[in-house]
Amino acid sequence: NVRLLTTEPVCVPVWGTQLTTPHVSDKYASVRLRTEVANAGNKHIRVVTEIISPDGKVVAAKDNTRKINHGQPFEQNFLVDAPALWSPETPRLYKASSKIYADGRLVDEYTTRFGIRSIEIVADKGFFLNGKHRKFQGVCNHHDLGPLGAAVNVAALRRQLTLLKDMGCDAIRTSHNMPAPELVELCDEMGFMMMIEPFDEWDIAKCDNGYHRYFDEWAERDMVNMLRHYRNNPSVEIGRAHV
């Protein structure tokens, strides 16, 4: 899909928010929101943010005003009591809804969907989700949909994921390009852990018309775009460069 967004000069750019959860427990979670604001130099920027729970209630809020230096994100920190943790069994999703004011005038609104969860990979011990050791029960899932072709079809993707869920699958490795946002959003909602990748060749060819032709020019940009695009999606656990 291609979308043309029209904004005020002072705005949140595409992929302009980063949400992290530095502390996660059953009692409370800390949520850190960093918001990029374009063209904000020498202006008083006010950001009003509400954290909305999976059942639609406002569970935390902040209203802050400050001047932002060029390239510096606007940071806000929240505490969420008794958080609903994201996992494949409980894919609960929160929203951070922000209103951006410049010199007292509303110029942009931006909503980021996210999950509260912790992940950790420990040498010789493995992967931990929300403090609990876990093994991936996963598949490698190519982007095409059989006779339907490669164009995104949300209903077909949902059917595919439902069948995988029914057989006990809880993880998906995509291949071999940046996955469609519709797939990642469905994995957020339905409870799949993901390992995503931007390309399947480096500068050594596997075929005549492969990614190696574009690696030097595009590899870093594609990797950065993939990580920025999906850094707030709770289903995305690992980003990798295929070898």
Question: In which residue ranges do the predicted regions lie?
Answer:
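Secreted/periplasmic carbohydrate-active enzymes, especially glycoside hydrolases
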Residues: 1-186, 190-194, 237-238
